[in-house]
A protein has these predicted regions:
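Conserved Rossmann-fold cofactor-binding substructure of NAD(P)-dependent oxidoreductases
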Residues: 56-70
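A short, exposed helix-loop element centered on a Lys and neighboring polar residues
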Residues: 111-112
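Substrate-binding pocket helix/loop in short-chain dehydrogenase/reductase
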Residues: 87-88, 95-100
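N-terminal Rossmann NAD(P)H-binding glycine-rich loop of SDR-like oxidoreductase domains
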Residues: 11, 15-20
């Protein structure tokens, strides 16, 4: 069974740079991004498999899991993120919830889903 890193947010500057670094070190990865056109370009450059999924969708893990097809995950790089910069007196509860919805909850769900796989690798 193949062992790969899982790179979520593979089309951003951090995720794409990490993909190239992993490839340069003769390691393997499975890329995940919401933009198929962009992630397929990185896949073509690296030869890595990929999934198209948006972490804000409730079924994003199922989409990824379907595409993994028996691949062992040896590490997760969560390269998705956003920061809403504004003075604290202008920040609303909705801003906090949106930030946690993107930057925190999806990565916790990923770790919960793949924790047994990560432990053995």
């Amino acid at each position: 069974m193949s062992k790969k890193f899982l790179i979520i947010g593979a089309t951003g500057s951090v995720g794409s740079s990490l993909s190239k670094l992993i490839n340069d070190n003769s390691l393997e990865a499975h890329l995940v991004a919401k933009n198929e056109e962009e992630v397929s370009k990185i896949s073509d450059e690296t030869g890595f498999s990929y999934s198209v999924a948006d972490v804000l969708e409730t079924n994003f893990i199922e989409k990824i899991e379907k595409d993994l097809n028996g691949i062992d995950i040896m590490g997760i790089a969560y390269c998705v993120g956003s920061i809403d910069l504004k003075p604290i007196n202008l920040v609303t509860k909705k801003d906090y919830l949106n930030s946690f919805g993107l930057n925190f909850f999806p990565v916790i769900d990923l770790i919960k889903k793949f924790q047994e796989n990560l432990k053995k690798n």
